C-alpha cells in the first residue's frame, strides 16, 4: 500500500470553553462579602500549519477525528480557568483546505476554499475554540451587585474539512503512459520511482531535486495522461491538480512508440487540449500564472533507438515553428540530459522572479481588513461580524398546522448557549438581554402571543420554549426575606462594625453629626437658663424625680426635706 495520500476528509472540533464560577467571597465575621467567581478558560482551536517536513496526508486518513483542548472552569477567589491548548496539525506545503459539503454518512465533496497553505509556516484556523463563560464578578455592576449565577462556556466549532495536496514543483513532466517520465526524473535526480514497461506504472506523483551548478530546482513526475483526463478518465483529475503549482510544463514525448495513430505532434496536441480543458476549471492562487501562459518545452525521448532518433530529427522543426524549445534525450544513455538540465535551471530562475513580482503586485492591490483585537477574550470568528440587523424572527408553520417562531442571529444563539436553564436568575438575565436587543418587540410585530412556541437556533444547539412576555425578572424570583432586584442580595449590604473599616468621608460625617448633637444640647440648656429654670436651685418643677435637687424622700411645704 502506498504511503502517499493527497486527499482526505478530516472532522475537526475546537475545544469547549470552561464555565464561569458563581463564587461568593467569605471574610471573618462576614460570610457573604460579595461575588468573586472567575471566568472560564477559552477552548483551544484546531490549526493547520504548512510544514516542509510533512510529505503526505497519510496520518489524517487513519486518524480523521481531531479535537483541541477544552478550557477549564473558573474558580472562586477570582481565579480564571486555564485556556485549552491549541491543536497544531502539520500538513505538506501546497495543501488546500476546503469546506466539506454533503449529507451525513455519505461521501463529502469540496465546497468553499478556506485556505491555501503554499509556503512554510502558513496557518489556517479551521475550528475556533469556544469562549469561556463569565464569572459572577464580571457580571456584577452598580445595579446587580451580587449575581447568583455565571455564564456557561460556549461549545467549540465543529465541522468537516477536506484537505487536498497539490505538489509544489518548478517543472512538471507530462506525457502519455510509458513515455519515460519516471526514467527521466530518476536519471536527473536521486529520486527512485517505480519503473516498468507497462502503462500507469506511476500511480502517485514523484518529486525529485535536480542540481545544476549552484542552483537547484524540483521536478514532478505526474502519472500518465490520456485523452479525456480532464473529465476523469484514467487517473486524470486525481493527478492533474498536481501541475497547478508548477511554473514550467515539460512535454515528454515517446518517439519509439509502436501504437497506431500515435505520433509526436498528435501526442503534443492531445495533451495540450486536456490541459486547456482542465485550466478552465481552476481557481488560481495569488501570483499564479494561468496554465495556458506558462512556458512549455518539448522533450523527445528514447533517441537511443535508431528509428526514434530519425523521427525526432524529422518533427523537431515542426515544434520549433510553434515557438517551443526542443530537447532530444535518452534516459538510457543519458544523451542530452546535461543540456536539458541547465536549460531548465535558467528557465526556472526567470519564472521564479516573474511569480514573485506577480505576488507582490497582487498583494499590494488587495485590501485586507483585520478585526479589532480583544483584550483577553477569544477573537471573533469570521461569521460573527456585527451588522445592522443582529437577529431575525420568522413565523414558521408545520405540516400539522402548528405555528412556531424562529429566532436566528449570532447574539441570541450565543446567549442561549451561555445560559444555565436550571438557574432562574440566569434565565431572567437571558430574558433581559433578549428584551434589550429587541427580540420581544419583534416577536410582537410578527404576531406572537403568550404561550406560542419560540425556537432560538437550529440543530443540536436549538432551544425551544413557550414565550411569556410578562415573565418577571425582578425581586419575586428570589426566595426568602432578603428581597431585592435580581442580582442584589440584601445580606451583602449589611456591615459588621467589628470588621468594617470607616472611610475618611464616613469619619467626617460622624464627627459633624456628633458636633451637631452637642450644639443642640447647648442650645437647649441656654434656652432653659434664659427661662429661669436655673435662677433658684432649690426649685424643682418635678417633685417625683428621684434625681432632683432634693434627693430621695418627700419635700415639706417649706421646702425642707424630711428624714
From Swiss-Prot:
Region (Disordered): 478-509, 528-563
Localization terms from the record: Cytoplasm
Gene Ontology CC: cytoplasm
EC code(s) of this entry: 3.6.5.-
One Pfam family recorded for the sequence: DUF1967
Top-rank taxon: Bacteria
Compositionally biased tracts (Basic and acidic residues): 486-509
GO molecular function terms listed in the Swiss-Prot or TrEMBL record: GTP binding; GTPase activity; magnesium ion binding
Residues annotated as binding Mg(2+): 182, 202
Limits of the OBG-type G domain: 169-349
CDD domains tied to this protein: Obg
Residue ranges annotated for the OCT domain, each copy included: 383-469
Keyword Magnesium: yes
Alphabetic keyword roster: Cytoplasm, GTP-binding, Hydrolase, Magnesium, Metal-binding, Nucleotide-binding
Class of enzymatic activity (EC top level): hydrolase
GO biological process: ribosome biogenesis
PANTHER family named among the record's database cross-references: DEVELOPMENTALLY REGULATED GTP-BINDING PROTEIN-RELATED, MITOCHONDRIAL RIBOSOME-ASSOCIATED GTPASE 2
Job of this protein: An essential GTPase which binds GTP, GDP and possibly (p)ppGpp with moderate affinity, with high nucleotide exchange rates and a fairly low GTP hydrolysis rate. Plays a role in control of the cell cycle, stress response, ribosome biogenesis and in those bacteria that undergo differentiation, in morphogenesis control.
Quaternary context: Monomer.
Name of the protein described by the UniProt record: GTPase Obg
Organism: Bifidobacterium longum subsp. infantis (strain ATCC 15697 / DSM 20088 / JCM 1222 / NCTC 11817 / S12)
